[in-house]
Amino acid sequence: MISIQSVNPNEDSFDLHSKEGVSYQISVYVPDTAPPQQGFPVLYVLDGNAFFRTFRDAVRLQARRSSKTNVLPMIVVGIGDARREDFVSERRCYDFTPPSSSLKLPKKPNGEPWSETGGADTFLAFLEETLNPQILEHYPIDTENEALFGHSLGGLFALYSLYTKPSLFSAYIASSPSLWWNERAILAKEEEFRKNLHNETLHKKLFVSIGSEEKGHMVTDAQDLAKRFSAINSSSFSFSFVEAKGENHMSVVLAVLSQSLRFISLRT
């Protein structure tokens, strides 16, 4: 049983606990228009304490005239740490990083040791088995039109989700993905996904962005990924890549936000 608090007529908030006892703050925006027969598309936003309000307002303002903006009315679900901080480093470091039998990481800029890593499968299970059923029970969602947004390590997680459990979402927004993590171990999962893409029966969409002013390896890693996915010719896969000129690791989210919303709003 969850206790849903109404923040305003179109927005709810509640705390949700994982099976492991981790508490998350869940924020939900619902358009003030009547839902279509199949329900609203839904966008799940990682680092919700930092990004939920930004995505909420972008959807709210643009979906008022979808015929002009090409942004559909959609439910926005923010997933944040229950401590209400924008970013909780140790939580992100665990939830968003893939498990690995061997871990090779650079030193952190502040010289502190890395906190526990490798919880991506556990977090995926929380999304699928705990959060998604609650959203489905309480809100009119289109179960065939669910998207996931993640930035930085969250972008890495979005890609990991696509590569390892593509049935969970139909569209993915990977903003400045941390492909460097653990000496680019994610590339093995990517290769396996690309090889098996012809077996995918449901259409998948992937939007990747990077700021041109980010660290060199971030930019080249994203560019290389874009080359690989742009070469795919498949009726079951759509891909878009944006390198935002003059944008840095944080500003890129705002710079390409509307483009990413238009992309996931495209009907396939």
Task: Locate the predicted segments by residue.
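Non-catalytic cap/lid and distal C-terminal segments of serine-dependent acyl enzymes
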Residues: 1-268
